[in-house]
Amino acid sequence: MKSFVWTLLGALSLGSLTTAYGANASNSSVPTPDNTLVVSYTNTSCYTSGPLSPDTRFNRTTRGTFSKVRDALKFRLNGPIHHWDIANELFDTALGVEIIDTQYGINNRTSRDWCTAVSALEKGDLIEFAAAFTAFDDVNPTKEVVPDALVGTLALWAKYSYEYDLTSIVSLFGKNWTVDELGWGTYIAHSLNEISSNTTGAANATLFIDTQTKSDCYKLASTIESWKYAPLSAFPNYGPFYIYGQCVATFTSGYSPLVEPAFTFASALNTTLNSFPNGTLPTQTQVVGDIGVKFLQYFA
């Protein structure tokens, strides 16, 4: 399998366990990390230099148990829930370690924190991670907390370890996500977004293509075409567009049935965006719309 540079969404400002739990931080279900790993950063991904050496791995001797993680997830059902909080707590409680980020400050999780942390996981950990999140999903199925942070993380880990592909990773969650359900395109490209000028979402999309098939690309093409009927608020972020561009670059040359839906979507979206007076388009839809209109430049 080809080797690619992967990174998680940069500069994630996530609260510590204490912040996430507020006054309830002393809850017995939430162990306090008691060892620290200081990570020094460069402008390149930690994946560019191969496996981490033993002295840079997490100290696993004080690792928390995943039963505590599951308890923590259930406890959080009683308060505000955010998927980054959950993922943050999962790493803290499972690994029993608090990361000091030398680039952004103490307790700020960034892409390289995740890059380092995920490389310390083992096969059994993946199964337990899946069990913890599945338990959370069962308790509160209306909360869409699981996929984007964790699936991106596991996808990165899988690529790095050369032991799993994305399909088997997702199967750990008991979910049959397919590209036409928007899951792959949005979650993976969003979670594996660029953090430096030489790492692009287009390159990250190669992970998807590396483990999927041409038929999946056609499903994504059909999905993108269907978005022309959707309100702006329903659009996912730019992930599917990067991946769709990679689909075209991988499986076609020039104009083809795989390319046509993209033009249909972009034309409809452009018409919709032009109906907004200047300065009135909401920020989030402006970003999505800008990419929706311009993403053709990537592969046309």
Swiss-Prot record:
<protein>
    <recommendedName>
        <fullName>Uncharacterized protein PB24D3.07c</fullName>
    </recommendedName>
</protein>
<keyword id="KW-0256">Endoplasmic reticulum</keyword>
<keyword id="KW-0732">Signal</keyword>
<feature type="signal peptide">
    <location>
        <begin position="1"/>
        <end position="22"/>
    </location>
</feature>
<dbReference type="GO" id="GO:0005783">
    <property type="term" value="C:endoplasmic reticulum"/>
</dbReference>
